[in-house]
Amino acid sequence: LKLLTLLKREDLKAVTFKGSETYLMDEDTPVLSPAAEDLAKRAMDYTPEKPLYVVAIGAITNVASALLLKPEIRDRIVLVWLGGNALHWPDNREFNMYQDVAAGRIVFGCGAALVQLPCAGVVSGFSVSEPEFKDYFLGKNELCDYLAHYAIEEGRRWAQAETWSRVIWD
């Protein structure tokens, strides 16, 4: 909600929904949450020809729960997810996937169009440095300032040298 305030989009707070508080217990039972319920309902207003694009980061519990609530939405959505590792990677020990393995199995196995942004082996190569944050973000708008200051603070906290760069995922 803070990001919506920074974007001066208070109007979107009414259509911003809380997600799940737990992970899936199995591959058959959804975790009910306002976010999953809204996604299941909202996706029904779209068609295979004009699908709803769903962008997700972190654990994929909400999307998997929506698919369990209304399996027919698989033909009405295109899921873009930052999670899992690249197919050539030797393992799939990745934070977002590990949080909810059952949800990962659902989204990969349901037949929905999926654009995976693999963490290790792909997104791990997307990095940005402090000078880049300062040059490209600071002074553009309140949201850019917030994100740049936050990322610079985090980068400095974890940096092992004066000069650093960090991966730009969630």
Q: At which residue positions do the language-model features occur?
A:
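N-terminal acidic, glycine/proline-rich low-complexity segments
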Residues: L1-D170
